[in-house]
């Protein structure tokens, strides 16, 4: 029974990293595209747009890091195994 729990934990860890990266990846692509459009329309606002973009990208990347933390806790600090 312990091997089934270990196998399920490995699968869940892989899914948590994969699914946690999908949303922020799409969001980062959209945000970068909109930032490039905004800079193309108003080149004088480049510094303000870039600063806002970098801050929002950091928040989006935090979601992926949370998925990595969940995966690492499932692999190395699993409460379901003895």
From Swiss-Prot:
Keyword hit for Endoplasmic reticulum: no
Entry keyword annotation includes Cell inner membrane: no
Positions marked as site (Reversibly protonated during proton transport): 61
CDD domains according to UniProt: ATP-synt_Fo_c_ATPH
UniProt keyword terms in alphabetical order: ATP synthesis, CF(0), Chloroplast, Hydrogen ion transport, Ion transport, Lipid-binding, Membrane, Plastid, Thylakoid, Transmembrane, Transmembrane helix, Transport
One annotated GO molecular function: proton-transporting ATP synthase activity, rotational mechanism
Membrane topology listed for this record: Multi-pass membrane protein
Role summary: F(1)F(0) ATP synthase produces ATP from ADP in the presence of a proton or sodium gradient. F-type ATPases consist of two structural domains, F(1) containing the extramembraneous catalytic core and F(0) containing the membrane proton channel, linked together by a central stalk and a peripheral stalk. During catalysis, ATP synthesis in the catalytic domain of F(1) is coupled via a rotary mechanism of the central stalk subunits to proton translocation.
PANTHER family: ATP SYNTHASE LIPID-BINDING PROTEIN, MITOCHONDRIAL, ATPASE PROTEIN 9
Subunit structure, as described in the record: F-type ATPases have 2 components, F(1) - the catalytic core - and F(0) - the membrane proton channel. F(1) has five subunits: alpha(3), beta(3), gamma(1), delta(1), epsilon(1). F(0) has four main subunits: a(1), b(1), b'(1) and c(10-14). The alpha and beta chains form an alternating ring which encloses part of the gamma chain. F(1) is attached to F(0) by a central stalk formed by the gamma and epsilon chains, while a peripheral stalk is formed by the delta, b and b' chains.
Identification of the protein by name: ATP synthase subunit c, chloroplastic
């Amino acid at each position: 029974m312990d091997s089934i729990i270990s196998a399920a934990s490995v699968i869940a860890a892989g899914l948590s990293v994969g699914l946690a990266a999908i949303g922020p990846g799409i969001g980062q692509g959209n945000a970068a595209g909109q930032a490039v459009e905004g800079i193309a329309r108003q080149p004088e606002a480049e510094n303000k747009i870039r600063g806002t973009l970098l801050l929002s990208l950091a928040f989006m990347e935090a979601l992926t890091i949370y998925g990595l933390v969940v995966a690492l806790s499932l692999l190395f600090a699993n409460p379901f195994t003895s």
